[in-house]
Amino acid sequence: MDRESCDVCGGDGYSSPSVTVDAVATRMRNGEIEALMIQRGPKPPEWHGKWAFPGGFVDVGEDPLDAVLRELVEETGVCGRNPTLLSVLGSPGRDPRKHCVGLFYRVDVDADSKPLAGDDAISADWVPLGMMSAENVAGDHIQVIGMISNAE
């Protein structure tokens, strides 16, 4: 199929999904696994008030490894290190805004860090995995919670 490119914007004529990254940080407290989570703001409305891993879109020209650490700081104020790819989720309907391929990274953080909500998050906190369900977690993040619950 012949695709037209644009010399002005650099577009290649392909309609491609966006790439997102999410930071998966966990700790053990009082015999329970807790994950560093944000409570989503009003956009998209389907996820308003639901828990999600801190994350966001990869900027043009940005390495996903840098993006996941940037998003972690922007949304929680927590610095991370050693991002390691945990999962890739890319179902076309996984995000109500548009087709997004999500890269979930395990990220090391200080287990005593005190998250502070930033960017578009309502709140940020360490949340016990046992308190999370499909009803209070945004989108397919519950699948990743299942992965880490079963692995630890």
Predicted segments, located by residue:
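Helical scaffold of the NTase/Pol beta-like nucleotidyltransferase catalytic core
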Residues: 150-152
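Short, glycine/serine-rich, charged loops/turns that create anion-binding
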Residues: 30, 42, 90
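Beta-strand scaffold of nucleotide-dependent catalytic cores
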Residues: 36-39
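Acidic, metal-coordinating catalytic segment for phosphate/diphosphate chemistry
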Residues: 1-30
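Unchanged
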Residues: 33, 57-81, 89-147
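A conserved beta-turn-beta hairpin within the catalytic core of GNAT-like acetyltransferases
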Residues: 44-49
